[in-house]
Amino acid sequence: MSATKLTRREQRAQAQHFIDTLEGTAFPNSKRIYITGTQPGVRVPMREIQLSPTLIGGSKEQPQYEENEAIPVYDASGPYGDPQIAINVQQGLAKLRQPWIDARGDTEELTVRSSDYTKARLADDGLDELRFSGVLTPKRAKAGRRVTQLHYARRGIITPEMEFIAIRENMGRERIRSEVLRHQHPGMSFGARLPENITAEFVRDEVAAGRAIIPANINHPESEPMIIGRNFLVKVNANIGNSAVTSSIEEEVEKLVWSTRWGADTVMDLSTGRYIHETREWILRNSPVPIGTVPIYQALEKVNGIAEDLTWEAFRDTLLEQAEQGVDYFTIHAGVLLRYVPMTAKRLTGIVSRGGSIMAKWCLSHHQENFLYQHFREICEICAAYDVSLSLGDGLRPGSVQDANDEAQFAELHTLGELTKIAWEYDVQVMIEGPGHVPMQMIRRNMTEELEQCHEAPFYTLGPLTTDIAPGYDHFTSGIGAAMIGWFGCAMLCYVTPKEHLGLPNKEDVKQGLITYKIAAHAADLAKGHPGAQIRDNAMSKARFEFRWEDQFNLALDPFTARAYHDETLPQESGKVAHFCSMCGPKFCSMKISQEVRDYAAAQTIEVGMADMSENFRARGGEIYLRKEEA
């Protein structure tokens, strides 16, 4: 926690400085590598952690070393993780996917924006200073065409996005030769299919079956392809966004870059304050990861925050506005039906979802069915024209462990399953959002119900938080539940920061939430038995046993904190080569003792072997040379 609280002016100035001086940066002793595919432009980034050699013998004067292989790891930081790429936030990122989109020949540029709100914003000269300078000319599907990755997959097409993902999901593990590093315990996958090698054909088949989605709006060509599905690596989402109380465009762009640096696979912009449209444009043009939104938040701003005044027309205009900016997935609370709202009356904490409470209030005030449910097919038509994936929101998720797994929660889940099938009719990709607050013993039912009710569409959960007693530490309480539900089959975990229930997260909160959730996701991958998931753990354990401190720092999810904690007690350079740490000291280090035991056992084996040879020599008469038939 920062010792001095910055003023709003200082926070904005700090964020502006971050943006102005931004450069591609690698983690300590890491380098950016690229693995190329067979299709044009498929060049997949990874981070390779360089390791120091292991001392295996020799003398002090002439030590003998054995090289350790570099460890490739998944990297979602895009150009921000490559020191060779010049970064200019004012210009945005390179349009990686634009040639692929254009080559398919099924899109057309729009001469006029479809959203009335967008037209009004562009015509307002007063916004020129806030506006992103290089506004993209949006595209949409040509008449009668669909441009979704699901549409292509169902027709047997392997897109460049699918090949990119296959290479990325394999994490470069084919480069690893060491049997020690490749060793992996069998997992318990709970029905997930985890092939030893992920191919582009496998990616296509999973997308075609609806078990995975590739969020990739044709108007967000800057994004690097990624996949969300039970049979792939567990992903992590980070939430950012301004509010009416705090945060600016500069700070949100800073949080975006910061999020990708610490491993966010997708980012949701949940802005509810001023300049939502302009903030989102800056975020999209500078984001290498898919961006999600909750359109009802902005639609509510357009009617001055009065839920009863919401209309389908205002919401539709918001969908078009955001789709043409490049939003990759929409959270839509279409499962909050009028008849389900009374089911929440006996809850301890009622309806805690912002989107859910907005729609519940609208339904009750008009005594009509949810207009998102009523117009769901029209929503799907819009999504199919831009390849916006749907994240079907859990507006009735439990907000306390007491309310977990109740009638309202599962009634909505059943409706989300119905909506999933409708979306698939339009070739629209779908994932399902889940809770929430759920005690550990009740978590698995959430996964089994989702798979059954929603036809194996990917599950995306907020935690769940396993206890309600730890404000300020809810990244821990939820990380426990996230690891469990990820193991059971959840495809993406929405991070929770230390500020959950308390306030809007800052940069450090974002980092803490992401590190916690990267741990949870990785633990789930290990438990499922995802091929190659244990390589980094094995490399860390080997470095730890061999007292290669620099390698231990660099293999960590957060090398800076690992080094800082070590140096608090052993700051000298000699501490980086010491065969102990401050926890046990030199005389009680279990690993040093283990090495001594191993060396002693090896020496004993040699001594016994020499004794056996001596006995054999004497038994043969003590002759130096044996006759040929005796040898």
Swiss-Prot record:
Keywords: 4Fe-4S, Iron, Iron-sulfur, Lyase, Metal-binding, S-adenosyl-L-methionine, Thiamine biosynthesis, Zinc. Belongs to the ThiC family. NCBIfam families: PRK09284.1 (NF006763), PRK13352.1 (NF009895), thiC (TIGR00190). Binds 1 [4Fe-4S] cluster per subunit. The cluster is coordinated with 3 cysteines and an exchangeable S-adenosyl-L-methionine. This is Phosphomethylpyrimidine synthase. Substrate binds at N239, M268, Y297, H333, S353, R354, G355, D394, G395, L396, R397, E433, Y460. GO terms for cellular component: cytosol. Catalyzes the synthesis of the hydroxymethylpyrimidine phosphate (HMP-P) moiety of thiamine from aminoimidazole ribotide (AIR) in a radical S-adenosyl-L-methionine (SAM)-dependent reaction. Homodimer. Its cofactor is [4Fe-4S] cluster. It is an enzyme of class 4 (lyase). InterPro entries: ThiC, ThiC-associated_dom, ThiC/Bza_core_dom, ThiC/BzaA/B. The lineage of its organism: Bacteria, Pseudomonadati, Pseudomonadota, Gammaproteobacteria, Enterobacterales.
